[in-house]
């Protein structure tokens, strides 16, 4: 599997940059992770390998993720069967040669909210908690020079490799690592994204400091997370679950989040978007059949979760490393 991660191409791409030394260490680090494995990894990887060959597809990444080619119904059926072997699909949507992967999240809606506020042309980007790589492809569509994503989830890696199978030359890499697996003081990326990660961290300030370590001086952080209404002293800590999630720790107000960014050493922190998450944006589909946001909200009051807490509201902030 490791050869399909194209780590040699990543090393060539980063040659001469501050990230080259790190890139040379990745094969050994990731080989060790693959040795640890996962009980379903062989099944997921088999699904990727069953994807049919499609020469020279046409690609649209600027407006959506879409791959096109001349093909017959048999190829499309083979494509759908293989992609269904990678269910559940959380982030998307994807159009694989006419097979519409209707994911749990309408991640394209989030990208429409975030992308107008970020200049990616010619930038070297790190996407922390990149999931299946949907945003990585959209970042390339917005002009990024290259995008490295890190996420330790093996299913997400296989979903990324399903897309990479048809886009082998594009400068996007998915590493099955957590942010904590990256070296300290990496300081090699122009832009770092952390979207939908901060509220899962027991120590949010440490997360912000680790993100800053990945940035060049003058680089930009794009931070998207759950927030609540309130002033700079307002932070919600759920007693147990939040929207049925056990691993949610801190939901700050926007003002508190701006304060956290300043305390972590960022400058020019500003909020560029605040949006309530709708049941149209996150829901169960044919490609993600488990419960989703409609089941996590109070059926009598959609402004509250089933635990009686404020319904999900997400903010995007951008800040600069001085």
Swiss-Prot record:
Keywords: Transferase, tRNA processing. It catalyses: carboxy-S-adenosyl-L-methionine + 5-hydroxyuridine(34) in tRNA = 5-carboxymethoxyuridine(34) in tRNA + S-adenosyl-L-homocysteine + H(+). It is an enzyme of class 2 (transferase). Transmembrane segments: none annotated. Its EC number is 2.5.1.-. The keyword NADP does not apply. Carboxy-S-adenosyl-L-methionine binds at residues 91, 105, 110, 129, 179-180, 195, 199, 314. InterPro entries: CmoB (IPR010017), Mo5U34_MeTrfas-like (IPR027555), SAM-dependent_MTases_sf (IPR029063). One of its GO terms (molecular function) is methyltransferase activity. NCBIfam families: PRK15068.1 (NF011650), tRNA 5-methoxyuridine(34)/uridine 5-oxyacetic acid(34) synthase CmoB (TIGR00452). PANTHER family: METHYLTRANSFERASE, TRNA U34 CARBOXYMETHYLTRANSFERASE. Catalyzes carboxymethyl transfer from carboxy-S-adenosyl-L-methionine (Cx-SAM) to 5-hydroxyuridine (ho5U) to form 5-carboxymethoxyuridine (cmo5U) at position 34 in tRNAs. Belongs to the class I-like SAM-binding methyltransferase superfamily. CmoB family. This is tRNA U34 carboxymethyltransferase. It comes from Pseudomonas aeruginosa (strain ATCC 15692 / DSM 22644 / CIP 104116 / JCM 14847 / LMG 12228 / 1C / PRS 101 / PAO1).
């Amino acid at each position: 599997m490791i050869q399909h991660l194209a780590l040699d191409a990543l090393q060539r791409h980063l040659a001469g940059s501050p990230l080259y030394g790190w890139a040379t260490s990745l094969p050994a680090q990731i080989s060790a992770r693959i040795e640890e494995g996962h009980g379903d990894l062989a099944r997921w990887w088999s699904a990727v390998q069953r994807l049919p060959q499609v020469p020279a597809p046409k690609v649209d990444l600027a407006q959506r993720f879409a791959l096109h080619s001349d093909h017959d119904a048999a190829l499309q059926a083979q494509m759908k069967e293989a992609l269904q072997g990678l269910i559940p699909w959380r982030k998307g949507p994807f159009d694989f040669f006419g097979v519409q992967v209707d994911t749990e999240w309408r991640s394209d809606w989030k990208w429409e909210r975030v992308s107008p506020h970020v200049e990616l042309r010619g930038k070297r980007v790190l996407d922390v908690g990149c999931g299946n790589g949907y945003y990585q492809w959209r970042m390339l569509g917005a002009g990024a020079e290259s995008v490295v994503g890190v996420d330790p989830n093996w299913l997400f890696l296989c979903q990324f490799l399903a897309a990479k199978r048809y886009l082998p030359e594009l400068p996007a890499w998915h590493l099955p690592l957590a942010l904590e697996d990256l070296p300290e003081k990496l300081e090699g990326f122009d832009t770092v994204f952390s979207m939908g990660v901060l509220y899962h961290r027991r120590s949010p300030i440490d997360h912000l400091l680790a993100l800053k370590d990945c940035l060049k001086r003058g680089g930009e952080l794009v931070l998207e997370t759950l927030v609540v209404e309130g002033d700079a002293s307002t932070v919600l800590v759920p007693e147990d679950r939040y929207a049925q999630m056990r691993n949610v720790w801190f939901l700050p107000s926007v003002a508190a989040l701006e304060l956290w960014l300043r305390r972590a050493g960022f400058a020019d922190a500003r909020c560029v978007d605040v949006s309530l998450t709708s049941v149209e944006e996150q829901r169960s589909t044919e490609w993600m059949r488990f419960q989703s946001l409609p089941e996590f909200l109070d059926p009598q009051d959609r402004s509250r979760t089933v635990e009686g807490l404020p319904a999900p509201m997400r903010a995007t902030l951008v800040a600069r490393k001085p």
